[in-house]
Amino acid sequence: MSILFKIFASTLAVVSVVNAGELLNFENERDIIRGSYIVVMKDGTSSSDLKSHMNWAANVHHGNLAKQGPSRSIGFQFSFDIGGWRGYSGKFDNDTLNAIVNNAHVKYVEPDRMASATVLKIQKNAPSWGLGRISHTFRGFKNYLYHSSAGEGVLAYVVDTGIDINHPEFEGRAEWGINVVDEVDTDEHGHGTHVAGTIGSKTFGVAKKVKLVAVKALGKDSRGPDSGIIAAMDWAVKHAKERGILGKAIMNLSLTGDTATALNEAAERAVEEGLFLGVAAGNNNRDAINESPASVETVCTAGASAENDEKASFSNFGSLRTSMAAPHVCGVAALLMSSEGIKAQEACDRIKKLARPAIRNPGNSTTNKLLYNKSGF
């Protein structure tokens, strides 16, 4: 969880300045990337203000490096502008960081850290009981029933380890979008391809006509920095806007980490801009309010259930939306957006309204509702 930063080693002096930003930190420092930071500007900062600020920060950084000699501090990595939520990330020395924190245009600075894909237990060539379950009001059915529109006209951004876009299960409906984590434009892990398959493959997909876009933000170890995930969301919002499909686009985030202010705010803005966000609650068997971006109120957070309609033993819990995994939720969102013509911003409420009270022993303050695709059975 992000808290106000009080002590930053012994080398950084935090100076009190009127209207200065705040330096945040995580209670659990396990996944922090040392020396890397996300800088978020104050509300109302224009794009030209951001550009001027970054020019100023670059000059400060270069000046400090010149005084200190060779350094690993490399400066800027990404810049963000999601519906007016603006900022940037980079690696900075302590003197530069101190100057940035105390700049009047800065809202806060948060250490960058590594987020991880939620673990998937994959049984190869196994029948998907989940498809049968979400299309029936009672368990025990194996057939999958769904509206014939099958998500046609909806675009799904899969922010993950990439997608094997040439896999025959995707029937040419998958395309490569952007890679913000490494130089390898393919899925070296398999997590992203599995997630994409659950959303929209011809055999195991919930929405079998949805188009899929690979947005690679996690590497072959299924981990990636928050800054890259934010950059991926920023790219997806702009891409959807350029294609004129805001309101008809969804984003799956089957990844998690401790609560992070910047990542949560970026997710909020992506929803405000017109994307449906389906997010994994996490696999740590704890309240999802402690996870990002699962703790964001406006995203559709999904926990996992078992075949007997009980909460899966590994799934997180809390007062956060329907059960079943995030890719299933994204698939149902695509179905409803295609068949009913609803907008992305309406899809989560529609999903919650359709969901059935079927989950047994869901956990503290947790919904007992199970995902349902409105098949009529």
Curated annotation (Swiss-Prot):
An MF annotation (GO) of this entry: serine-type endopeptidase activity
Subcellular location: Secreted
Pfam family, one: Inhibitor_I9
Annotated EC: 3.4.21.-
Database matches in CDD domains: Peptidases_S8_PCSK9_ProteinaseK_like
Keyword list, A-Z: Glycoprotein, Hydrolase, Protease, Secreted, Serine protease, Signal, Virulence, Zymogen
Boundaries of every Inhibitor I9 domain copy: 36-114
Annotated GO biological process: proteolysis
The keyword Cell cycle belongs to this UniProt entry's keyword annotation: no
InterPro entries, per the entry: PCSK9_ProteinaseK-like (IPR034193), Peptidase_S8/S53_dom (IPR000209), Peptidase_S8/S53_dom_sf (IPR036852), Peptidase_S8_Asp-AS (IPR023827), Peptidase_S8_His-AS (IPR022398), Peptidase_S8_subtilisin-like (IPR050131), Peptidase_S8_subtilisin-rel (IPR015500), S8pro/Inhibitor_I9 (IPR010259)
PROSITE patterns on file: SUBTILASE, SUBTILASE_ASP, SUBTILASE_HIS
Cellular component annotations (GO), alphabetically ordered: extracellular region
Domain Peptidase S8 intervals: 128-377
Glycosylation sites: 252, 364, 373
Catalytic residues (UniProt): 160 (charge relay system), 191 (charge relay system), 323 (charge relay system)
Source organism, top-level taxon: Eukaryota
Signal peptide stretch: 1-20
Enzyme class: hydrolase
Positions annotated as propeptide: 21-118
Family statement drawn from the similarity comment of this UniProt entry: Belongs to the peptidase S8 family.
Protein function: Secreted subtilisin-like serine protease with keratinolytic activity that contributes to pathogenicity.
Protein name per Swiss-Prot or TrEMBL: Subtilisin-like protease CPC735_012930
